[in-house]
Design a protein with these regions (language model features):
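Short S/T/G/P-rich N-terminal loop/turn motif that feeds into the first structured element of a domain
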Residues: 1-190
């Protein structure tokens, strides 16, 4: 598929210039069927440096020229987020669930205070979590929680356990008192 081939090429350019570049296919939920190209950096300085280098890369210029002549999809973003809890693993997780909450700025501290308890619950099912917030994006009152799984089977088993777990249900209730769940999605690593 032309779009997948182009995304992989773009990701390769970004990785050559220092990004930990990952491509996900959104399998269900918000934006199902779309692709998500994600680049991770250790600092904003590293991200800025990579952005400048990749923007000057002839391969990326060629790719955008090909796209202009024969579009194969729409590009949105880039948005920039910062990790506020739970560092992403060096090896990307094959399956992710992302949940986006609208959280007024005055309630961010209380929402983040629940992250260690959420992490402890998911460690019991051999999963990890991460929380990011926007630095440059359309909505600065969003908080995204990512649940990481080793496989589709692992995700199913973990979710079976969590939906029956009263401590998890209590956390979800509290989260919905502090913010409003606006979106959720399931993604697979390409």
């Amino acid at each position: 598929m032309l779009m997948e081939e182009r995304i992989r090429r773009a990701s390769g350019v970004m990785a050559r210039h220092g990004a930990a570049s990952r491509i996900f296919k959104i399998q269900g939920g918000d934006s199902a069927g779309d692709y998500l190209l994600m680049n991770l950096f250790n600092s904003f300085s590293a991200a800025s440096s990579t952005f400048q280098k990749m923007s000057a890369d002839p391969e990326l210029a060629k790719l955008f020229m090909e796209r202009a002549l024969n579009p194969a999809g729409d590009i949105t973003g880039p948005d920039i987020f910062r990790s506020v809890y739970g560092e992403p693993p060096e090896k990307p997780s094959p399956i992710l669930i992302g949940r986006g909450y609208h959280v007024p700025r005055g309630k961010v501290k209380d929402m983040l205070a629940m992250a260690p308890e959420l992490e402890a619950l998911f460690k019991k099912v051999d999963s990890s979590i991460g929380v990011v917030m926007p630095v440059i994006a359309a909505d600065h009152e969003m908080m995204y929680i990512t649940y990481r799984f080793t496989s589709m089977d692992h995700m199913g088993s973990a979710l079976d356990t969590m939906v029956e777990n009263q401590d998890f249900q209590n956390l979800i209730t509290k989260a919905n008192e502090l913010g409003t769940l606006k979106m959720s999605r399931m993604m697979s690593l390409m």
